[in-house]
Amino acid sequence: MLSKNRIKYVNSLKIKKYRQLNQSFIVEGAKSVLELLNSDFEIELVLATQEFQQKYSSISSQHKTLFETVTLTELQGLGSFQTNDSCLAVVKTKENVFLRAEDSEYVLILDDVSDPGNLGTIIRIADWYGIKKIVCSENTTDVYNPKVIAASKGSFTRVALFYTDLAKYLGTNAGDKMVAGAFLGGESLYNFKFPIEGGYIIMGNESNGVGQEVEKFVTHKITIPRFGEAESLNVGIATAVILDNMRRGEKGIGKGE
């Protein structure tokens, strides 16, 4: 049986200030925990049902000192999602390490993306399209929010995020790199040519788009052509469309299924 202190500690990590205080966060569900166990994240503990440990006996035996057996009832009482029926991990957060676009590399920039589900989805999309770095404004939602982690489906283990003041960051680091921003009124994405030298792609806030302070650094405004009557696209969907068009301009890079 889990101790009261253990239950209190895990539950506290659902709140941002306690994640920051303890420098820890929670990861729920078999897929995400399995990816976590194969990553470079430092894991404090894994609370798992007996069934999970038996099903994945090889990997659980490799990390047996981390595992603590719990019942399904205990697990569902701790987690944020009732669909979690296998495991939950407590993990140390990483340092907020500086990131920038290297030669021929594209980096995503998120300007005040506020919805955790959207951020998690964008991380997953970035992973799919081979984007390894995301630079976030200080007001972008916390990457360690349980909803972000869940929506990323394990991709948080492969995509690095850096939080910073975007205006200062771009002023110092953009240099002669292309900085493309997603806007409602810009050059058609279908006609835009992403340079092989790489650069930055900015996605804005769900309601307000790219802020004025960040817009100053945009060298190319691009838009996804609209054919129907919808007012706008979800920022996650828009990110996928833009990255897909970017990769379409490259030949022989994608991994076939």
Segments and roles (model prediction):
Residues V70-T71, D111, S137-E138, A160, ...:
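Short beta->alpha connector loops at strand-helix junctions that form conserved
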Residues Q54-K64, V214:
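Short, aromatic/basic amphipathic alpha-helical patches
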Residues F67-K92:
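Glycine/small-residue-rich loop that forms an oxyanion/phosphate-binding "nest" at active or ligand-binding sites
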Residues N38, E95, R100-G186:
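RNA substrate-binding interface of SAM-dependent RNA methyltransferases
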Residues S86-A89, W128-Y129, V143-T157, Q212-G256:
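Structured adenosyl-cofactor binding patch, chiefly the S-adenosyl-L-methionine
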Residues G181-G228:
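Active-site/ligand-binding-proximal alpha/beta "capping" segment
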Residues M1-Q54, T140-T141:
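Boundary-proximal intrinsically disordered activation/regulatory segments immediately upstream
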